[in-house]
Design a protein with these regions (language model features):
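Intrinsically disordered, low-complexity and often Lys/Arg-enriched segments
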Residues: 1-7
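Solvent-exposed alpha-helical segments within well-ordered globular domains of core cellular machineries
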Residues: 7, 19-22, 40-41, 71, ...
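Dynamic helix-loop-helix/coil hinge segments at AAA+ ATPase domain boundaries and subdomain interfaces
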Residues: 8-14, 29-30, 60-81
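Interdomain "pre-motor" coupling segment immediately N-terminal to P-loop NTPase/helicase cores
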Residues: 14-65
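Conserved P-loop
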Residues: 36, 81-159
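Active-site catalytic microenvironments for nucleophilic, acid-base chemistry
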Residues: 45, 121-125, 187
Length: 239
């Protein structure tokens, strides 16, 4: 009977329940539980497994370069790592608002780590996330154009709850790059959240987009206005 129940639960794709049922059977605890308590335990096991599976899938799809977590952060207000601000962002309320987060500071102070940690936190909360180095993002947009898949590419990017763009500002954008970046930002503006990490202070971002002043103004208005800012300073943590 116990084996049949296990197989039935598996055939119904209730593997969390099935494993919990088998554990209860093997530890001889079935007889100690009321029907209500037993059902509650099985349902919780199924819920936990589905949540864990979904989180693992979201983390894999996000393609993070760094395995980072909020718990690993060392807070230091003097260096811009304000505990209250970062823990507030870790609630993912900014994602519900469709707001941007801008993380700036010199090389090695932890920009990518903080951006990635917030991205991981969003996955744990059930949001669809994608991490992308800016140069790789430009290459992906370029290839999508060449392969006549631009519409599909931009639709997929627009559907992400959170897009994490790392190393923004390493090169000046021009031509189609500016148009593509504008389209990416426009599709997400006010609807979906974007985290941008950069060595350049925000006041210098215009220079990266300056080859088309109209686009530069439009992009910065959408990205910077109402954004949450984390401005890091101090010596490199890589030393």
């Amino acid at each position: 009977m116990n084996d049949q129940i296990y197989q039935d639960l598996k055939s119904l794709h209730l593997s969390g329940m099935a494993q919990s049922w088998m554990l209860l059977h093997e530890t001889r605890k079935l007889g100690e539980l009321t029907l209500q308590d037993g059902m509650a335990m099985l349902i919780q096991a199924e819920h936990d497994q589905r949540t864990n599976n979904r989180t693992a899938r979201l983390l894999s799809q996000a393609r993070f370069r760094y395995n980072a977590s909020i718990e690993e952060l060392t807070f230091d207000t003097a260096q811009g790592r304000d505990k209250n601000q970062i823990l507030s962002l870790a609630t993912c309320e900014y994602i519900k608002q469709g707001a941007s987060v801008l993380v700036t500071g010199p090389a090695g102070v932890g920009k990518s780590f903080i951006a990635s940690a917030l991205g991981h936190q969003a996955c744990f909360a059930g949001y669809k996330v994608r991490y992308a180095n800016m140069q790789k993002l430009l290459e992906d947009m370029h290839m999508a154009r060449i392969e006549s898949k631009a519409a599909r590419f931009f639709d997929k990017m627009a559907a992400l709850d959170l897009l994490v763009i790392d190393d923004f500002g390493m090169k000046i954008l021009d031509g189609q790059q500016l148009l593509d970046f504008m389209e990416l930002i426009e599709d997400r503006h006010g609807r979906k959240s974007t985290i941008i990490a950069s060595q350049l202070p925000v006041k210098n971002w215009y220079d990266i987009l300056a080859k088309n002043p109209t686009i530069a103004d439009a992009v910065l208005d959408r990205v910077v206005k109402s954004a949450y800012r984390i401005e890091l300073n101090g010596v490199s943590m890589r030393k």
